[in-house]
Each structure stands twice: as structure tokens, then as C-alpha cells.
Regions:
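Short coil/turn connectors at secondary-structure junctions
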Residues: 13, 19-22, 50, 56-58, ...
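Internal active-site segments that recognize and position negatively charged phosphoryl groups
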Residues: 143-192
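C-terminal binding/interaction regions
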Residues: 4-21, 90, 94-160, 164
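Acidic, glycine-rich active-site loops and adjacent beta-strand->loop/helix elements
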Residues: 67, 89, 167-169, 198-203
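Glycine-rich oxoanion-binding loops at beta->alpha junctions
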Residues: 28-45, 137, 199-222
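Long amphipathic alpha-helical segments
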Residues: 14-116
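Buried hydrophobic packing segments
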Residues: 65-73, 103-106, 144, 148, ...
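Glycine-rich phosphate/diphosphate-binding loop of Rossmann-like nucleotide-binding domains
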Residues: 171-221
């Protein structure tokens, strides 16, 4: 069963992280009115987090699913348990591409291994998936910053950028995808203003505005 956590929420906090034999997630269903972490201790906890959109965004869903496999194998690393965990997690969001990609990667890494080493290997592979997303976010930010610098040379006043949905750190394991260059530009001192379009079903624009507000990036929600 999911349990609340007293972990503080900071500007640089990850959306999920391992803590011992459990995983902490930022419960996005409570945002922007309440900031709280929830502890995932079982496969069922991870499945619920994905299904209920406590975690959302393709990269974050994939990483959470990977950790869900690790949570499942912590108590039973048999072939049957691995197959059950895979099926359970795939059913949470059948159309989520990163979910299936992450589970395919976990299966490929774990199925050939003896059961005695599977649990540790599952945690290692899940962490590798999280770290790969961190690196991808950083690379997107770096390359995007170069483009924004070029645009700034021919722009009078702040750069005007429009975003759709939420593609920031709430949707990933790092600084985000589409928002990563915006954060990099703001940190580099470029004048920038973001027009945040509202979307459904989870008011993702409001989540983007919440992110940008915490980072001090000028923005308008429309």
C-alpha cells in the first residue's frame, strides 16, 4: 500500500528516486495546490501510480514501470513473478510508448539471468533507465540552448516561446524535454517569456506554469 513520505519538495527534487527498498514519487495529482511525496513499496503501488497519473509524462512513466519491476522482484524473482509484473504494468497505460519500451528493456536484461541475481539486477537496470533519461534531458537542454542563443541575436526584447502540454521535469527524470532548453536559457541569462497553453485531461499547462514559477521563468498561462 502506498504511504505518505515526509521528504521535502525542493526546486531540484527528482520526480522519483529510490530510497532503500522503496521508491519515492512526487504525487502529481495533488499539484499545484499540495506538494507531497508518496512511497511505493510494491508492484501494486507502482501500477496504481501510473494508472492514476500520480506520475505522468512518457519518460517518467517508463522509469516508474522499470522500478515497479524491481519492487516486484524484491520479494519473488521467479519467471512467473517477472511475467506477472510485466503484464500488470503494461495494462496500466496500454498506449504509453515509453512504458512498453522500458518493460521490454527490463525483460531483455532480466529474463536470461538466474533468479538469485535478478532482484539486484532489476534495481540496477531501473536506475540505468533513470540515468539515461537524465542524460538525454541534459543533451536536449544543451542543444536547444544553442538554437535559442541564435534566435536571441535577431530578436528585440525577450524571446517569446509557446509550450503545449507539460514537457518539463514533472514529465521526466531530469529537467524535461521541451522545457530543458528554456531552463538552460534562463540559467544562461537569456531574456525569455513563455506562453503556456492549457491542456487536458490533467491541466498540464497549469503544471508547466507551476514549474516555470518555481524556476523564476517569466510566463503567461493562456
Amino acid at each position: 500500500m502506498q504511504t505518505p513520505s515526509n521528504a521535502p519538495v525542493t526546486d531540484t527534487c527528482p520526480t522519483l528516486r529510490r530510497e532503500g527498498d522503496s521508491v519515492l514519487i512526487l504525487d502529481q495529482t495533488r499539484l499545484p495546490h499540495e506538494e507531497a511525496f508518496v512511497r511505493l513499496a510494491t508492484l501494486a503501488d507502482a501500477a496504481l501510480a501510473i494508472r492514476s497519473m500520480q506520475v505522468r509524462g512518457a519518460p517518467l512513466i517508463g522509469a516508474t514501470a522499470a522500478y515497479g519491476v524491481a519492487l516486484a522482484l524484491a520479494s519473488d524473482a521467479s519467471d512467473a513473478a517477472l511475467a506477472d509484473a510485466d503484464a500488470c504494468l503494461r495494462a496500466t497505460r496500454p498506449t504509453a510508448v515509453n512504458l512498453h519500451w522500458a518493460l521490454d528493456r527490463m525483460l531483455a536484461a532480466l529474463a536470461p539471468l538466474p533468479t538469485v541475481v535478478r532482484s539486484m539486477a532489476a534495481w540496477t537496470e531501473a536506475e540505468a533507465i533513470r540515468c539515461a533519461d537524465l542524460a538525454a534531458n541534459a543533451a536536449i537542454g544543451e542543444h536547444g540552448l544553442g538554437l535559442l542563443r541564435q534566435l536571441a541575436l535577431s530578436t528585440q526584447g525577450p524571446l517569446q516561446i509557446m509550450t503545449h502540454c507539460n514537457a518539463g521535469w514533472l514529465a521526466t527524470c531530469g529537467h524535461g524535454t521541451a522545457l530543458a532548453p528554456i531552463y538552460a536559457a534562463h540559467a544562461a541569462g537569456l531574456a525569455i517569456h513563455v506562453w503556456v497553453s492549457e491542456t487536458r485531461p490533467r491541466n498540464q499547462g497549469l503544471l508547466t506554469a507551476w514549474e516555470l514559477s518555481r524556476a523564476g521563468v517569466p510566463h503567461t498561462l493562456v
